[in-house]
Swiss-Prot record:
ATP binds at G335, P336, N337, T338, G339, G340, K341, T342. This is Endonuclease MutS2. HAMAP family: MutS2. GO terms for molecular function: ATP binding; ATP hydrolysis activity; ATP-dependent DNA damage sensor activity; endonuclease activity; mismatched DNA binding; ribosomal large subunit binding; rRNA binding. GO terms for biological process: mismatch repair; negative regulation of DNA recombination; rescue of stalled ribosome. Residues 711-786 form the Smr domain. The lineage of its organism: Bacteria, Bacillati, Bacillota, Bacilli, Bacillales. It comes from Bacillus cereus (strain AH187). Its EC number is 3.1.-.-, 3.6.4.-. Homodimer. Binds to stalled ribosomes, contacting rRNA.
Length: 786
């Protein structure tokens, strides 16, 4: 990536802001060395990594990166045999703790179900050196001093030192409190000179105390004397201090050697936490500028939704939708110089640079960006004083360099292309330069105030015009990018707002060709149409999102309903099976009793015994069967029943003989030795009549039964449909269904009306309604049963 491109697009300013979010010099070094990548896979991984760190921040608010310092030079010194200071060793211990703490932090989140595959891979490389960490912290205090407990020998030496110091102070304090002390001493204090305890003695009394003079005051009137009586004690104290120093050095060398043994692991851990500091800095920066993760594609197109420049306050900048690379490869932004065109140009460039650096970009979700091998930018007035180049020449030198290197994997940004020279020649050069880079397949965004380039976008298939909206009422740009609408100068409107007379403005209009006026009017209408279309699109998008939300909610409710329905049906089926099984056992017992009755002399069987047995047999049927009375289709053809016909009673699966018809729908039937009333719908005709045989019931068979939750009438004739509805509702009631659906379709509405007219009269219907969204709407009637 060209250094000039990074400079003019203010990439380093973004890095300066990123630096503010690092926790250590390790992370700061990573930021300082950050440059955009051109490798697609690497960029995707960097974006995913930043996204995981952003997820951690959303869930936890921060990451435990405190206490980590750059200890690499200290570790390398330990590796070559140098002795580390207590503070240097303490920094190593703190960094080891920080890396271990970070590892535990990420692993705990993963254990709790948070998906962080990339960060988990990073922390998996951290090797815990807990033993070494504890050795250092056990020997060195938070203030950087070697503590007494570092070794038994050091504790003993320091006990000796404290004892010696106490004895010396006691003797000297006795001297300062003597009767002659006020006369001979300059001050009644005990002090230290050259690491030995002394007292301040007046010059004329130096011989009274004897001993050694270690210092004197500036005036020479006071001598700091070590009295003879404590010289031996001071000597003993100094010997103990030498031993203390030797023991401390031994401890520090021991710890340094242990660091040297683990040096490679420590350095590896440092590299991991440096990367983690860098990664989380990017995530914190994304939060600061309200950035999101872009979708990175390899198809050479970008779609930036509501893009903002990261260096401009998000509260004041106007976001823009910027698309490039699909329907068109070049955007030519025309309009006046003060219209915010350069901000749009820089927004495109800096977003690409940030994305290719693994940074999230200030756009809305689902924005897409592609990878460019080269990004070229000719922006701003960078004329060279040393080379005595004009503005035009300076730009042209840069453009020549761009034309030598640009290809189909390049993004080229031109600001005020062709400016700084004769307008006619500048416009011609601009068109020629744009043609050249477009023909190479590069993606191009160019700004210009030349009106000649307005037609350029209409004459080239892959080029589109754009402009930055200008509010003539406030005389300022709105910075709203209008794709597909060329810019206009607004000179007449601005002049009128500023007070120029209508007469002068009208004369000015007369100096412009009719075609130019028509073009300006056309552009004005395009701007208005663009704004209206954008407003309509925003409203439609809001409705779409609302519809999707409702759809998701309905899907969730349907899934929950189906799950609950299936659970209840399963429970009901299980209960039904248990009841049927119990009924079978009870029926078998009753049948056994009837067999015993048959074996007995039939004349001796009392009527009440038969009635009781019949009642118990009917009561043995499970509840569902008793409600249904075998609600099944009679597979036999319709037959005019007569007394004496043999039939099969479906409830019990037994044959019987018709005795007499007791009502329009019921017959008296002889089943073995039992006589009972049976509905015609509960019997099946048998072709071969037999004489009634009195025999006991042998078996009672159960029968599977199923009724669908919906009835589909589409394609049925009206009469057949009504008959099916009648039977279906009876079946559904017998199945104890609380709710069913009847599908009649929309069509002409005749079948729908017929169904609902019938439902109004049916005594088993509680309420009914049309289907809701997701249930079939007007093509379905949902029936609530009593």
């Amino acid at each position: 990536m060209l250094e000039r491109t990074l400079r003019v697009l203010e990439y380093n300013k973004v890095k300066e802001q990123l630096l503010e979010h690092t926790a250590s010099s390790l992370g700061r070094d990573k930021v300082k060395n950050l440059v955009p990548s051109t490798d697609f896979e690497e960029i995707v991984e960097m974006q995913d990594t930043t996204d995981e760190a952003a997820k951690v921040i959303r869930l936890k608010g921060s990451a435990p990166l405190g206490g980590i310092t750059d200890i690499r030079s200290n570790v390398k010194r330990a590796k070559i045999g140098s002795m580390l200071s207590p503070n240097e060793l303490l920094d190593i211990a703190n960094t080891m703790y920080g890396s271990r703490n970070m590892k535990r932090f990420i692993e705990d989140m993963v254990d709790n179900g948070v998906e962080l595959p990339i960060l988990a891979t990073h922390v998996a490389q951290i090797v815990s050196l807990y033993d070494l960490e504890k050795k250092i912290t056990n020997c060195i205090g938070d203030g950087g001093e070697v503590v007494d407990s570092a070794s038994d020998k050091l504790r003993g030496i320091r006990t000796q030192i404290r004892t010696a110091e106490s004895r010396i102070r006691e003797k000297l304090e006795n001297m300062t409190r003597s009767s002659n002390a006020q006369k001979m001493l300059s001050d009644s204090i005990v002090t230290i000179r050259n690491e030995r305890y002394v007292i301040p003695v007046k010059q004329e009394y130096r011989g009274v105390y004897g001993g050694i003079v270690h210092d004197q005051s500036a005036s020479g009137q006071t001598l700091f004397i070590e009295p003879q009586v404590i010289v031996e004690l001071n000597n003993a104290l100094q010997e103990a201090r030498v031993k203390e120093k030797q023991e401390i050095e031994r401890i520090l060398l021991m710890l340094t050697e242990e660091v040297a043994v683990e040096a490679d692991i420590v350095l590896s851990n440092v590299e991991v936490v440096a990367n983690l500091d860098f990664i989380f800095a990017k995530a914190f920066y994304a939060k600061r500028i309200k950035a999101t993760k872009p979708i990175v594609n390899n198809e050479r197109y970008m779609d930036l939704k509501q893009a903002r420049h990261p260096l401009i306050d998000p509260e004041i900048i106007v976001p823009n939708n910027i698309m490039l690379g699909k329907d068109f490869t070049t955007i030519v932004i025309t309009g006046p110089n003060t219209g915010g065109k350069t901000v749009t140009l820089k927004t495109v460039g800096i977003c690409v640079l940030m994305a290719q650096s693994g940074l999230h970009i200030p756009v809305m979700d689902e924005s897409e960006i592609c990878v460019f091998k080269n990004i070229f930018a000719d922006i701003g007035d960078e004329q060279s004083i040393e080379q005595s180049l004009s503005t035009f020449s300076s730009h042209m030198v840069n453009i020549v360099d761009i034309l030598e290197k640009a290809d189909f994997e390049s993004l080229v940004l031109f600001d005020e292309l062709g400016a700084g020279t004769d307008p006619q020649e500048g416009a011609a050069l601009a068109i020629s330069i744009l043609d050249e880079v477009c023909n190479r397949g590069a993606r191009v965004v160019a700004t210009t105030h030349y009106p000649e380039l307005k037609a350029y976008g209409y004459n080239r298939e892959q080029v589109i015009n754009a402009s930055v909206e200008f509010d003539v009422n406030t005389l300022s740009p709105t910075y709203k990018l209008l794709i597909g609408v060329p810019g206009r100068s607004n000179a007449f409107e601005i002049s009128k707002r500023l007070g120029l007379s209508d007469r002068v403005i009208e004369q000015a209009r007369n100096h412009i060709s009719t075609d130019t006026n028509k073009i300006e009017n056309m552009i004005a209408k395009l701007e208005e149409s663009q704004k209206n279309a954008e407003r309509d699109w925003n409203e439609a998008e809001a409705l779409r999102k609302q519809s999707e939300k409702l759809h998701r909610e309905l899907q969730r409710q349907i899934i929950e309903f189906n799950e609950e329905r299936d659970e209840r049906l399963l429970k009901a089926q299980k209960e039904g099976e248990e009841k049927v099984e119990a009924a079978k056992k009870e029926a078998e017992g009753i049948i056994q009793e009837l067999r015993q009755l048959r074996k007995a002399q039939l004349a001796n069987v009392k009527d009440h015994e038969l009635i009781e047995a019949k009642s118990r047999l009917e009561g043995a049927a499970p509840e569902l069967v008793k409600k249904q009375k075998v609600n099944v289709k009679n597979t036999a053809p319709k037959q005019q029943l007569r007394a004496g016909d043999e039939v099969k009673v479906l409830t019990f699966g037994q044959k019987g003989q018709l005795l007499e018809k007791v009502s329009d729908t019921e017959w008296s039937v002889q089943i073995g030795i039992l006589k009972m009333k049976v509905k015609e719908s509960n019997m099946e005709y048998i072709n071969t009549p037999k004489q009634t045989e009195k025999k006991a019931v042998a078996t009672v068979k159960g029968r599977d039964y199923h009724v669908s939750l919906e009835l589909d009438l589409r394609g049925e004739r009206f009469e057949n449909a009504m008959a099916r509805v009648e039977k279906y509702l009876d079946d559904a009631q017998l199945a104890s269904y609380p709710r069913v659906s009847i599908i009649h379709g929309k069509g002409t509405g005749a079948l729908r009306q017929g169904v609902q007219d019938y439902l109004k009269k049916h005594r088993g219907v509680k309420t009914f309604r049309y289907g809701d969204m997701g249930e079939g709407g007007l093509g379905v009637t949902v029936v609530e049963l009593k």
